[in-house]
Amino acid sequence: FAPGMVSQKCLLCMCKLESGGCKPIGCRMDVGSLSCGYFQIKQPYWIDCGKPGKDWKSCSNDINCSSKCVQQYMKRYATHYRCPLNCEGFAREHNGGPNGCHSSRTLKYWELLQKIPGCKGVK
């Protein structure tokens, strides 16, 4: 995984939750638009993270590029919206988009992440 403010362990847990075991699963329809790859990244998220790699879909299916996108997205939004700078804050921001860390609708995502073996209480 790419280095950054999100811990490697937190990235692994997010990756496992998003792609059923941290796999390059391609694109799937999710709430009316495509989500792709290891972290199920949508095109607007990829644009917001600075458009790393060749293009959105290939970046999403490359573990280094997609984790770099997540790190850059958090650098941009988690600090701006004063999210807790821990795995819960990052995971909820990833799930809910800008300011998602403060939304009650992202609590279920965090609860699901903690049920993954080895992810309970991850920082």
Named regions from a protein language model:
Residues 1-3:
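N-terminal prepro-regions of secreted/extracellular proteins
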Residues 43-103, 110-118:
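Alpha-helical segment that forms one wall of the substrate-binding/catalytic cleft
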Residues 10, 34-37, 90, 109:
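Residues that flank catalytic or metal-binding motifs in active/ligand-binding sites
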Residues 26-54:
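N-terminal, post-signal-peptide region of Sec/Tat-exported proteins
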Residues 6, 33, 105:
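Short acidic-hydrophobic sequence patches enriched in Asp/Glu that either
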